[in-house]
Amino acid sequence: MVKLRLKRIGKKQAPFYRIVAADSRVNRNGQYIELVGTFNPLKDEVKIDKELTLKWLNNGAQPTDTVRSLLSKQGILKALHESKFSKNTQTENKKPVSKKTTKKSKDN
């Protein structure tokens, strides 16, 4: 399963994180599939590529609790919800076409 999670980089007492899409079986600072954004907790600075994040979330990637919090603060989860909701309402608004049965009249 692919997860969106934090990968710690930086020095001691100066944490800096990359927000990455990674296989859940790989360790925290191991290989990752794609870099999605960065997070600097000392300056409370978050930079996230919205398109990449939405791509991974639509493909089934699960964010960790911390990343979910960061995504909601950036408004990305709201955008994901609206995109899914708008797709559902468009399909629900279309009425299914029913076939009407016609009776054949006999000419006698």
From Swiss-Prot:
| Keyword Transcription carried by entry | no
What is the primary gene name for this protein? Answer: rpsP
Similarity field: Belongs to the bacterial ribosomal protein bS16 family.
**Recorded GO terms, molecular function?**
structural constituent of ribosome
Record HAMAP family? Ribosomal_bS16
InterPro entries documented for this protein = Ribosomal_bS16 (IPR000307), Ribosomal_bS16_CS (IPR020592), Ribosomal_bS16_dom_sf (IPR023803)
Q: Which UniProt keywords apply?
A: Ribonucleoprotein, Ribosomal protein
Task: Give the GO cellular component terms, alphabetically.
Answer: cytoplasm; small ribosomal subunit
Q: Which organism is it from?
A: Mycoplasma capricolum subsp. capricolum (strain California kid / ATCC 27343 / NCTC 10154)
Q: Region Disordered: list its residue ranges.
A: 82-108
Q: Does the keyword Ribonucleoprotein apply?
A: yes
The protein's matches in NCBIfam families, at most eight in alphabetical order, are given as:
S16
Q: What is this protein called?
A: Small ribosomal subunit protein bS16
